[in-house]
Amino acid sequence: MADRSAIQLIDEEKEFHQSALQYFQQCIGNRDVGLDYHVISVFGSQSSGKSTLLNVLFNTNFDTMDAQVKRQQTTKGIWLAHTKQVNTTIEIDNDRPDIFVLDVEGSDGSERGEDQDFERKAALFAIAVSEVLIVNMWEQQIGLYQGNNMALLKTVFEVNLSLFGKNDNDHKVLLLFVIRDHVGVTPLSSLSDSVTRELEKIWTELSKPAGCEGSSLYDYFDLKFVGLAHKLLQEDKFTQDVKKLGDSFVMKGTENYYFKPQYHHRLPLDGWTMYAENCWDQIERNKDLDLPTQQILVARFKTEEISNEALEEFISKYDESIAPLKGNLGSLTSQLVKLKEECLTKYDEQASRYARNVYMEKREALNTNLNSHISGTINEFLESLMEKLWDDLKLEVSSRDKATTSFVESVAAGKSKIEKEFNESMETFKKLGLLISNEEITCKFSDDIEERIKQLRDAELKAKIGRIKKNLVPELKDHVIHLLSHPSKKVWDDIMNDFESTIKDNISAYQVEKDKYDFKIGLSESENAKIYKNIRILAWRTLDTTVHDYLKIDTIVSILRDRFEDVFRYDAEGSPRLWKTEEEIDGTFRVAKEHALEVFEVLSLAVTSDNVEIIPDVPMAEEESGEDNEIYRDNEGVFHSRRFAHILTELQKENVLDQFRRQINITVLDSKRSIITTRTHIPPWIYVLLAVLGWNEFVAVIRNPLFVTLTLILGATFFVIHKFGLWGPVVNVVQSAVGETRTAIKDKLRQFVVEDHEVKESFEMKDFSKNEQKEK
């Protein structure tokens, strides 16, 4: 059967065609057929005109017998052809369905003789996979038992019931009996009744399996009958009858339309091929195995002997031929193929004379031994190739343009490239039959590449974490220290807000969703989450270290003293206070002390404004342990808590308060001394002395209009300042002016002294130079 339009689906050796799916794909091209296809089989006696009928009806090109030469078997096995052109009486304009036609080897042929195993299995297969089974028979065969294949149909019905009878679906097969050479003497209805009675009788007498005892023939099959005129004697009528038959395959919606929904297997085309192959496998395995005969035993012994001789000769030539070529794929594969073919040819020449099944069995074993020996060389070559490809991958990743190509893209591209090259090399060995199974090698290659990519990924991750740490740690320290050095009642709220925002700012480039991050190195969601957790651990440890290192006793005392002095020494506008009375000092002292101690408890225990203790949301220790939150004693016998929020112990708090009280008390005493000094600085009699001694000047001022005007202005200014209590700001302005004047005078004097000193030094250097010249 050489026609390109058909393939041998099952050959005469009962082997299913492994490229059936590719054939279907070639037939339909890129079209999405879905369920819009149909399968038809033809079944009947050998040389009964089955292939001829199919060719005329479906425009196929199955081989047919030339009766003028010899009546013999033409169709061997089961052949499959595709068509969309059905011979009909009218033209069908709409798109016709895809029809796949199975031409089954004829039954009752002399070539197989009494071996009816294949024809039974072929008939059963045709019923199992087809929607319509055309039973081709001659009119004169009706009424016969063997001649019209009733015995075969009985066997097929029995096996069909045992294999497929328990299915709960409503699938049926249409048995279309085509009665050939129908001359019309006996009406078609009479012939159909005869065949129907025979089939019903056969079904009644079947040995039905459990669960199918009450089943009917019509539960599984529908019956249709068509008569065709004699092809040679009534050629025109035969053609017309065939066209009428074709109408029933294309006229949808009519009563005689053959492709009814219940006949379809409801499988896509590629699913049907798998179903057909499984059916044939199930049918083929349903047999008894025969014991080997003496002839088979001899064949096994001789083929084993020939195989060993060929293998020994192969091994003797192998090493010296292969060693120089291990680094060149083309030369290596050519030599391996040559050695292998020489070995198999030697075996074939001698062993092919024995039983074919034994010969092929031993040949397969020899081929396996050869491949096993060759696999060592192939593995060595592929391992060397793996190292080279890995070096290429590392180079490509390290030399990538980081501005335009991400790590993941670079690794993916490099991995794809080396996998392609590796697979191409491996496929070369496989196509040449040198490598039977590549699963182990592929797995090893994949595992090795994944492990090495993991190393690259770890290095990239380490670099990313390093960059994040470089920015995160100092930024976090600076912000925390700044907030703690100027604390408020809500300082811990501010610290935690700043803590979260600092983390977020440093890893915002990797955020994909809320609380979800992708660090762009090809990690899974859980792995990215783990890295994010590690970054938080780093941040929390930095926060913990910064807080506990900064908030020592001396630092807290200094913070409290600064807060005290901000209120005690300066008013609300930031101006220095001028004390008048001790009561004013004492009142301000109490306010300043309260202001300072507002944050004492805040700095002793890290709690939010809602009085909730701050607890890290990640483990602070290297490993979780039950000791993390326990109290421990230091070398000096002082108890401490391991909790982040616990900053000062009770003993440390007392120490802070003692130091703070001492320092602020000193400040208050100094302020009170300044009042006493101011009050006792000028004795009252000085004012009397000034009045007596300055009387002449006073009279001179009164007599001079200019002096009088200045006196009035100064007096009014003095009154206003005194009336509204503006002496404090005036004193501040005067002090500032005096201070600036003093500073300016000092700078001028310093500049004058420095310049004078430089002039003297220059003169001395000139004198020194002259003296040296004189000495020379």
UniProtKB/Swiss-Prot annotation:
UniProt keyword annotations, A-Z: Endoplasmic reticulum, GTP-binding, Hydrolase, Membrane, Nucleotide-binding, Transmembrane, Transmembrane helix
PROSITE patterns documented for this protein: G_GB1_RHD3
EC number: 3.6.5.-
Domain of life: Eukaryota
Residue numbers on the Cytoplasmic membrane side: 1-681, 727-776
Functional description taken from the UniProt entry: Cooperates with the reticulon proteins RTN1 and RTN2 and the tubule-shaping DP1 family protein YOP1 to generate and maintain the structure of the tubular endoplasmic reticulum network. Has GTPase activity, which is required for its function in ER organization.
Designated name of the protein: Protein SEY1
Source organism (scientific name): Saccharomyces cerevisiae (strain RM11-1a)
